[in-house]
Amino acid sequence: MINDRETIDLERLSLPHGAPAVVWQISDSPVAYPEAVAAMEVRAAAIAAGEAPELVWLLEHPPLYTSGTSAKPADLLDPRFPMYPTGRGGQITYHGPGQRVAYVMLDLKRRRPDVRAYVAGLEQWIIATLEHFNVKGERREDRVGVWVKRPDKGPGHEDKIAAIGVRLKRWVSFHGIAINVEPDLTHFSAIVPCGVSDPRYGVTSLVDLGLPVTMQDVDVALRAAFEQVFGPTR
């Protein structure tokens, strides 16, 4: 079956030539989740008011779980880390060291006020990033995020390598994506990641796939791929 998100025209997700470039910011130290959410709320409001430029914020969190608007309490199997309810879409996910989180604050009213197109754009951004490391990421119609096939684990097995969760206020996006670079994958065993309980579907990372990449390598690839989909950064 063709995933209908693959057929969405992404061309209009970028701003016209000459528009201000997106600010690209990287935090070197882990950022507490409540601090990150508060900062996103402030920045998104400022973008909506025309008082601040768009922003992509790359960071890592200390170990924690977040629950989206579709989360089921039963999907938290072992509450070994703090759990934070959040207004993003999706279910329960894990964030922690070794995972590159990218919070994306874009004015979709100026770009394209279409949530499905925006999510497809985030997926394409991740897929293009993975291509830098010769990893084939794929969309799935019934599973949000980006997946890689794992024939080494058996027929039909796939692992999730990146998660997506978004929220919009006044057509400004926040929250965003998370790519597994080298997290402790055992931390995912305490939840049903994103509500997917089928044993054929697991979680992986770039390092788990045998790629000796660093967070800095991923950041370079993320920036190049972002500019392909959403336009220039500064």
Curated annotation (Swiss-Prot):
<feature type="active site" description="Acyl-thioester intermediate">
    <location>
        <position position="194"/>
    </location>
</feature>
<feature type="binding site">
    <location>
        <begin position="176"/>
        <end position="178"/>
    </location>
    <ligand>
        <name>substrate</name>
    </ligand>
</feature>
<dbReference type="InterPro" id="IPR004143">
    <property type="entry name" value="BPL_LPL_catalytic"/>
</dbReference>
<comment type="pathway">
    <text>Protein modification; protein lipoylation via endogenous pathway; protein N(6)-(lipoyl)lysine from octanoyl-[acyl-carrier-protein]: step 1/2.</text>
</comment>
<keyword id="KW-0012">Acyltransferase</keyword>
<comment type="function">
    <text>Catalyzes the transfer of endogenously produced octanoic acid from octanoyl-acyl-carrier-protein onto the lipoyl domains of lipoate-dependent enzymes. Lipoyl-ACP can also act as a substrate although octanoyl-ACP is likely to be the physiological substrate.</text>
</comment>
<feature type="site" description="Lowers pKa of active site Cys">
    <location>
        <position position="160"/>
    </location>
</feature>
<dbReference type="GO" id="GO:0005737">
    <property type="term" value="C:cytoplasm"/>
</dbReference>
<feature type="binding site">
    <location>
        <begin position="88"/>
        <end position="95"/>
    </location>
    <ligand>
        <name>substrate</name>
    </ligand>
</feature>
<feature type="binding site">
    <location>
        <begin position="163"/>
        <end position="165"/>
    </location>
    <ligand>
        <name>substrate</name>
    </ligand>
</feature>
<comment type="similarity">
    <text>Belongs to the LipB family.</text>
</comment>
<dbReference type="InterPro" id="IPR020605">
    <property type="entry name" value="Octanoyltransferase_CS"/>
</dbReference>
<dbReference type="InterPro" id="IPR045864">
    <property type="entry name" value="aa-tRNA-synth_II/BPL/LPL"/>
</dbReference>
<keyword id="KW-0808">Transferase</keyword>
<protein>
    <recommendedName>
        <fullName>Octanoyltransferase</fullName>
        <ecNumber>2.3.1.181</ecNumber>
    </recommendedName>
</protein>
<dbReference type="GO" id="GO:0036211">
    <property type="term" value="P:protein modification process"/>
</dbReference>
<keyword id="KW-0963">Cytoplasm</keyword>
<dbReference type="InterPro" id="IPR000544">
    <property type="entry name" value="Octanoyltransferase"/>
</dbReference>
<feature type="domain" description="BPL/LPL catalytic">
    <location>
        <begin position="50"/>
        <end position="234"/>
    </location>
</feature>
<dbReference type="GO" id="GO:0033819">
    <property type="term" value="F:lipoyl(octanoyl) transferase activity"/>
</dbReference>
<dbReference type="Pfam" id="PF21948">
    <property type="entry name" value="LplA-B_cat"/>
</dbReference>
